Amino acid sequence: MQYPEPIAKLIEGFMRLPGIGPKTASRLAFFVLEMKEDDVLDFAKALVNVKRKLTYCSVCHNITDTDPCRICEDSKRDESVICVVQDAKDVIAMEKMKEYHGKYHVLHGAISPMDGIGPEDIKIPELIKRLQDDTIQEVIVATNPTIEGEATAMYISRLVKPTGIKVTRIAHGLPVGGDLEYADEVTLSKAMEGRREL
């Protein structure tokens, strides 16, 4: 059956989201059709605001609605420690455990030669520039425990070690092949406690 164009376009839009296939997209589109108009308008406004009002912090590259972000601006945080993560979602996961009080650096990816992603394609040059600040004493590498995450961790370690800054890696309380954003607070907390020097 051919859907009316507005529904077909909405289904198409939902299918652009990761993990959403044609059946789920269709269910979502028909759910939206049944929503109250005010709720649909609020939802549409939220989608537009995400694109218009959010940016990346010029210091740590986390998502933010202020620049620098609130974490970078927080004078109560430990400026001597930087936790390096792959994605902005990982910062949210780390913050949920409420045990890490340092700063962050978001790479926006991992080194993956198979996908043509090298160190210059992610925020590694920006990290090295940040490390020229004499206050930094430790870099915690919290990339995902995947082949790409491990390759990125080793690359960062080789770059940072000669500077005399301590480089540690979070412990693998996290499943190999898993993503930080899906880990619970206890698992993340144990992984941070068991971090090791690289």
UniProtKB/Swiss-Prot annotation:
SUPFAM superfamilies: Recombination protein RecR. A zinc finger (C4-type) spans 57-72. The keyword DNA repair applies. GO terms for biological process: DNA recombination; DNA repair. Residues 80-175 form the Toprim domain. InterPro entries: DNA_Rcmb_RecR, Rcmb_RecR, Rcmb_RecR_Znf, TOPRIM_dom, TOPRIM_RecR. Pfam families: RecR_C, RecR_HhH, RecR_ZnF, Toprim_4. SMART domains: TOPRIM. GO terms for molecular function: DNA binding; zinc ion binding. Keywords: DNA damage, DNA recombination, DNA repair, Metal-binding, Zinc, Zinc-finger. It comes from the Bacteria. May play a role in DNA repair. It seems to be involved in an RecBC-independent recombinational process of DNA repair. It may act with RecF and RecO. Belongs to the RecR family. This is Recombination protein RecR. It comes from Halalkalibacterium halodurans (strain ATCC BAA-125 / DSM 18197 / FERM 7344 / JCM 9153 / C-125) (Bacillus halodurans).
